[in-house]
Amino acid sequence: VPRGPRFIAVLIAVLALLHGLPWLVLVASPGWSTAVTVIGSAVFLFAAIGFPFAMMRGHGRHHADRSAVAADAWLGIIWQFFVWSVLGGVATLVLRAFGVHGAARPVAVVVAVVTLGLLALGFQRAMRVPPARELDVVLPRLRPGLDGTRLVVVADTHFGPINRAGWSRRTVAAITALKPDILAHVGDLADGSVDQRREQVAPLATAPATLARVYITGNHEYFSGAAEWIAHMDALGWDVLHNKHIVVERGGDKLIIAGIDDLTAASSGQPGQGADINAALDGVDPALPVLLLAHQPKQVATSVAAGVDLQIAGHTHGGQMWPFHLLVRLDQKYLHGLSRHGDRTQLYVSRGAGFWGPPFRIFAPNELSVLTLRSPEAAGS
């Protein structure tokens, strides 16, 4: 991580803006009493100074989970206060232009109430067991024997500094109730090492599927050692699709399930890592339909070139915290849902089951994606 003067200057500017605007709208402008103004100013100053240190201690070499929890939570809180303070500041200026003065205090109250309400709702949505989002997907090359195959997708669990072992057990119970034929985890399993997150991941060993349980790496596995997570998921009984494929069969008909590494794998510096669609599909019968697990939606270009029938991705969290989706869309055109690409390929992007960093989901609900694969013959009957 850079530590030069330019980096320090940019960091100070970002922290000043992120904390300064909410301070201006909520504390300085409304004309509160001296005591309220002093206390409010002290809170924002302490947070602006303490936040980067907590972030470095939590996510740096110390990997101190308590510091990470505090820093991540504050990042989400101050982001929402910043966003709504921008809107509140604009509202105040518009009202002033129309001759309405003295709006700063009611605007501050509205900004505070809306922000705190959304944060409370967002925390509940982030920590809940993800609800099922069900969808039928017609695959033109799928044969009738595999019609009705239930593919349950769990993505972006991000087991991390907040111990969610109980959430993990309840989520596996929800998966069990969905009766998957194929259970797919499409990466970003955890933030941290296997030793740190073993308890949270353990319930996945009992998650059932009648045909296959398959897993691929996301970009976050490469922050803590992808090889260790690959070995651990293999030990839990999952098929790790590390640039490889398996064949599942039902009713005399077959489906290829392939997986490739995340886009960041090749640049991670970790031996043997890097997306390789040719290796993943080596020896595949070209007449068979292909389901590909690839963590990032923009890997769909690879899927189209390889003639994949359906790519399953995660990574985006649907934006996780409004309006962060606008920034995510700069990198990933497809944030969630089903889309078509080229003559054959379809892409489904899951909003994910968990959260990264701030424990909030605002206007981007979590989900267990339940895709019922349909053959055209059965779908048309």
Identify the residue ranges that each predicted region occupies:
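Hydrophobic alpha-helical transmembrane segments in integral membrane proteins
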Residues: 105-112, 116-141, 160-166, 224
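Non-catalytic terminal accessory segments
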Residues: 1-128
